[in-house]
Amino acid sequence: MKWLLLTLALVAALAQAQTTPEALALLRKIHLATQKLSYTGTFVYQQGGQTETSRITRIADAAGGIEKLEALDGTPREVVRTRDTVRCYLPDRQVVKVDRRDARTFPALLPDELAELAQHYVITRGKRARVAGLDCESVVLMPRDELRYGHKLCADAGSGMLLKARILDNRGEMIEQFTFTQIAIGSVSRDRVKPRHDARSWRVVETAATPANMAESGWIVSSDLPGFRKVVEVRRKLRESGSVGQVVYSDGLAAVSVFIESLAGRSDPVRPGLSNLGAINIVTREVANHVVTVVGEAPAASVQRIAEGVVFKQLQ
């Protein structure tokens, strides 16, 4: 009963709350800083009782910049990202994976069209704090419905660089967060973004993607979630033969991906149901001798809703 009263109080508060111009201005400052500034730093990802530490280095330039992300815990791996190419170096397997995807990662989490976020989030200024030895200003994005998570961002008061990002559930409790523990903003040597390993003799695996229309194969993939619109529809090469179809929906901040893969030739068993990792919820179904996997940084009910909307109709 107490939880219900808190939820009703939150809904009532959001109904009266309004996005403020000051909050939108801070979002624009954060977005500009993550795109235009060069920096290097160490951040910690936390969800539940698990943590991962990474080092990120970015050089901003007229070509769109270059960025290197290094895992400092567990299995060694490096990711080097340019404007349109992502290379993942796996030294233990001597493999380089090449992709053309452009997924946003911390600290560059915000979309270009910030004003559209106010349709689905109440955006307000939060309290000042201190992160990585720097004074930071916070902005809170609380969802106007239960279909998406809340977000709290804290940025360097001077430069606008995002220092901390937290995802919140519908009770305002943390699901996961990214936090810089050390960061240097300013000129960065280009040597800092070069791969650590000489990978000229390594095996290169390209994840080729081509535009696709799933309806032409009989698949109906749609989303009735307010604000989530289709932003990607492609087919990707998978293993030596075969492929997987992918459709991505996004509200500008959160994204949900639908993957459709034939069961023919698949050796590992399919485990239908719901699973999750931090803020990521995953729903797996079998449909028409295919496995449908829906992965999204959204509440389980939202991901389930999109998964149940995937149907196959035999073409005449």
Task: Annotate each PLM feature.
Residues M1-L4:
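Positively charged n-region of N-terminal signal peptides that target proteins for export
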Residues L8-A17:
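Hydrophobic h-region of N-terminal signal peptides that target proteins for export
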Residues Q18-Q94, Q119-L168:
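N-terminal mature ectodomain segment of secretory-pathway/periplasmic proteins
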Residues C88-L109:
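Acidic/charged, solvent-exposed loop-and-adjacent secondary-structure segments enriched in E/D, K/R, S/T
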Residues P111-L168, W202-V247:
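Extended beta-strand-rich segments in extracellular/periplasmic secretory proteins, especially
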Residues S159-M161, L168, G172-D191, T293-Q316:
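Surface-exposed amphipathic alpha-helical segments
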Residues G186-N213, Q316:
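Short, gly/Ser/Thr-rich active-site loops of penicillin-recognizing serine hydrolases
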Residues S201-A288, A300-R305:
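Short, solvent-exposed recognition patches
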